[in-house]
């Protein structure tokens, strides 16, 4: 766990060239399906990076906190390093997997959302502490990464509670091939209103 301190179709090369390769943040609460979705994307030809590996490679991560098992990341330092390192676009479409990925210098953000009750079941099955389960449920309930929305890059979200990883990947591919259409916070899923919103 990381914490902040302060269809497998291939892309059409022609279409990819038109859109341009990007690094895309794949964010969402713990248990929302990020790593599973990332693995399906990897099998379909995407490059996959993780926030944890990037932080480790760039000496931006602390030792594990014995209280909750989290490894605090200096996300400000990491972002500063990557702004320079990522000045050029990647050679392949790249996914940056991690719930802090939307805070890095990515070219778009994919937010995975999950019904809080289903998310609770997933987290409890992992034997997480009550405090860790509750904090992740709260983060999902209030909108998760949308609270740190950056209007300068395209954002979109997908609901993973009832949709299979393969179907979600299909939607992600469609979003990319359709030109990264930009969602806005007011279209996001609102669990308080019963999960309404444009998915």
Stretches with model-predicted labels:
Residues 26:
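Hydrophobic anchor at the beta1->P-loop junction of P-loop NTPases
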Residues 29:
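P-loop (Walker A) phosphate-binding loop of NTP-binding proteins
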Residues 32:
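ATP-binding Walker
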Residues 35:
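Walker A/P-loop
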Residues 47-104, 195-197:
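ATP-dependent small-molecule kinase phosphotransfer cores
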Residues 63, 114-156:
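A glycine- and Lys/Arg-enriched "phosphate-lid" helix/loop adjacent to the NTP-binding pocket
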Residues 125, 150-199:
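NTP-dependent small-molecule kinase module
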């Amino acid at each position: 766990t990381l914490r902040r301190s302060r269809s497998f179709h291939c892309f059409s090369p022609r279409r990819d060239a038109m859109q341009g390769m990007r690094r895309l943040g794949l964010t969402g609460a713990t248990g929302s399906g990020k790593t599973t979705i990332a693995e399906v994307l990897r099998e379909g030809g995407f490059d996959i990076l993780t926030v944890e590996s990037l932080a480790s490679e760039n000496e931006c991560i602390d030792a594990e906190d014995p209280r909750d098992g989290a490894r605090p990341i200096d996300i400000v330092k990491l972002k500063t390093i990557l702004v320079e390192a990522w000045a050029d676009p990647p050679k392949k479409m790249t996914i940056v997997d991690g719930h802090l990925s939307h805070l890095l210098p990515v070219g778009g953000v994919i937010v995975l959302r999950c019904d809080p009750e289903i998310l609770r079941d997933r987290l409890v099955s992992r034997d997480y502490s009550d405090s860790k389960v509750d904090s992740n449920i709260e983060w999902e309930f209030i909108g998760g990464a949308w609270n740190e929305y950056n209007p300068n890059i395209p954002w979109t979200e997908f609901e993973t509670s009832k949709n299979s990883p393969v179907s979600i990947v299909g939607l992600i591919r469609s979003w990319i091939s359709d030109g990264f259409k930009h969602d806005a916070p007011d279209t996001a899923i609102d669990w308080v209103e019963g999960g309404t919103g444009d998915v």
